[in-house]
Every structure is written in C-alpha cells, then in structure tokens.
C-alpha cells in the first residue's frame, strides 16, 4: 500500500547511493508529457492478474521486485515491457497503461552526468506456467495489499515506487511508514 504523504511529487529529486557506490538523484515524471531526456534504461510493470493479484519476481540473490528489464536494440518502451515481462515472469501483457517515468542522474565520478530513464507501467497480464530463465529463479503472485510489503526498493527511492504503485492500483495507505 502507499501513504499519500510519502509519495513522490513530479520532478522532486531523491538522493541515493546504489550498490556499486555511485551517487544518484532519482525523480518521478508524469506520463502525460514526453519522456525525460536520457538513456532509455528499460521498462518496469506493476503486473496485475484478472483477479487483481500482483506478479513479483526474484532470484537467489535478487529480492522480490516488479517484472522489468532493459531494451534490446531499438525496442520502444512498450516492446521492452512486453518482452521482459514474458521473459522474467512467464506472463503475457494483455494491455498496459504508462503510469510515469523514473529519471536518475549520476552526480559523482566516474559516471557523473549519466542520465537514465525507465518507463513505469500498469500491466494486465495472463500468467503462464513457470519456466525460470536467467537470473530470475522465483515468481510469486500475491494480493495487491501484500506487494509493497514484499518488494525491496530502498527507503530513498521508496516515494517513487509508492507513487507508481498508487498510480497503477489506486491503493493509498493512511498509516505513516
């Protein structure tokens, strides 16, 4: 669930350090304007089943997360979403709505100035038999109210993920974090 007081607002940046020690500023961007400038870094989906449950994926050393992936060649945002959701969760995207973008900019060497953009979607999916591939070795289908409790997205970028989850599901938690 999400807390209205802890959701990202348009264009407001959040400082964070990634697992490789790089310092970044991440921000939420609305879908009703063109995507922010930067390197296309993939698509992610809050994937809902016809029952309203949510598909999560993970690996041996990968915590639960929403299905996502990077583009191959010149794929557009939609093609990346569709292909990666199938590859990592064995689910077919039936329809999808763009809910926003996350923009991250590296603010310290050696990658200072690098800007990456990821599209964030709400996707209605059909779940197929599980055939794990690559680094994704686990899939879990959970009620929507459990999804954010299981996904590890870090405290700093949490407001962006909560905004995306709210935009995709409509859930708002009135309890503070």
Where are the regions a protein language model picked out?
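Class I (Rossmann-like) S-adenosyl-L-methionine-dependent methyltransferase catalytic domain
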Residues: 26-29, 34-35, 105-108, 115, ...
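Conserved Nudix-box catalytic region and its N-terminal flanking loop in Nudix hydrolases
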Residues: 48-91
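A short coil-to-beta-strand element that immediately follows conserved catalytic motifs
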Residues: 92-101
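Nudix hydrolase/Nudix homology domain
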Residues: 130-177
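Acidic, metal-coordinating catalytic segment for phosphate/diphosphate chemistry
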Residues: 2-44
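Acidic surface patches and DE-rich sequence motifs
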Residues: 16-19, 49, 59, 109
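Active-site-adjacent beta-strand/loop module that shapes the phosphate/pyrophosphate-binding cleft
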Residues: 102-129
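Conserved hydrophobic/aromatic beta-strand scaffold that supports enzyme active sites
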Residues: 46, 120-122, 139
